[in-house]
Curated annotation (Swiss-Prot):
Gene Ontology MF terms: cysteine-type aminopeptidase activity
Organism whose genome encodes this protein: Lactobacillus delbrueckii subsp. lactis
InterPro entries the UniProt entry points to: Papain-like_cys_pep_sf, Pept_cys_AS, Pept_his_AS, Peptidase_C1B
Protein's name according to its UniProt entry: Aminopeptidase G
Active site per the UniProt annotation: C70, H361, N382
Gene Ontology CC terms, in alphabetical order: cytoplasm
Annotated EC: 3.4.22.-
Pfam entry (one): Peptidase_C1_2
Compartment(s) where it occurs, according to its Swiss-Prot or TrEMBL record: Cytoplasm
Signal peptide: none
Enzyme class, broadest EC rank: hydrolase
Amino acid sequence: MSHELTLQELAEFSANFNADPKNQVIARAAARSGVLEASYNERVAGRLTRVFSTELPTDNVTNQKQSGRCWLFSTLNVLRHDFGAKHKAKNFTLSQSYNFFWDKLERANLFYEKVIETADKPLDDREVRSYFDFAGHDGGQWHMAISLVKKYGVVPSYVMPESFNTSATNGLASALADKERKDALALRRLAQAGDQEGLEKARKTFLNEIYRMVAIAVGEPPKTFDLEYRDDDKNYHLEKNLTPVSFFNKYFDVDLDDYVVLTNAPDHEYGKLYHLGAEDNVEGGSPILFLNVPMEYLEQTAVAQLKDGEAVWFGNDVLRQMDRKTGYLDTDLYKLEDLFDVDLSLSKADRLATGAGEVSHAMTLVGVDEDKGDIRQWKVENSWGDKSGEKGFFVMSHNWFKEYVYEVVVHKKYLTKDQQELLSSTPVELAPWDSLA
């Protein structure tokens, strides 16, 4: 049944609002400083500290600037922690630009493939539309990053440093999106006509043009480089003529295939393996897999990995209850319910199911604070530069972890036997518009 707002109803709403004098005081405060500042809970600062019972050695933070590459930054942060610990090299950083280059090319290739596969469906089909919407996109997942590392290796940041177009990706992303969508229409026509020869020729031409665009904007990646650094004991190290792949294989003590994305998505069935094929970025690369488990397993495995001296990649909804200046993450940080006198509560499952919750960011766990086995707070390495938080490091309450963390990446050795067996099960395929996308 439809309902039209009447003048009588609106007058009643206004009378109700003005009947309480406190509303005018609150409205003036909110109008002057904004609803977040007006509802800021100062008591949170008294609960969150910068001291942790388990804490990894940390380096200077990185800065993704105006780009959506947090997933790549967090992955490379985990890897540089491994390099720093193994080779006693503080503040050694890896090039995000290098893997960003290959990501753009690989994504275009897979986008063209999906366009060809779905050429028999109309453009307004939900699956087809989701692929077109994702063209030129920066966002990503853990498995997307490791697919790039496994295929192309890594290089130190001085070999391929950040540039304008990697730090502010909108211009390139927009151009790539326009190019890929235009190409997609041509590929659909060729596929619908059954012109296989023309299809392969066009795809190769289009990928050659994508390569040129990214090379102009970012620069071509190096084929070889010289590794040069001084360790914490002031010893000088030099190895010449390394390839990015040989550098990774020789200098990093990690098998990326041994790591698992544990997710807590209570709108999905627990004890299941899920595959988000729509966001795979490398043909033949690591599929995007999630093992969905109750929250306590994310907590337990993350703590165990930190205690063993290894950082933890984690996916979260950072825009919720976050103060960028202080670096505080706490569920009671902004008391919006008190400000508006309404109930804003949603369960984690309901937030995911309605689009109110999402994995909007990836960061790195580098510490945890426990009191007699109870987790109080976590130390977080962000990728927003050193002007936010304490020199770029955030403090996250455990309540925030439970509400707004959806994924942690841990070694499979920390899983239960049953969970390890699930890794070889047939995954449930997720739609491109799923809440985990």
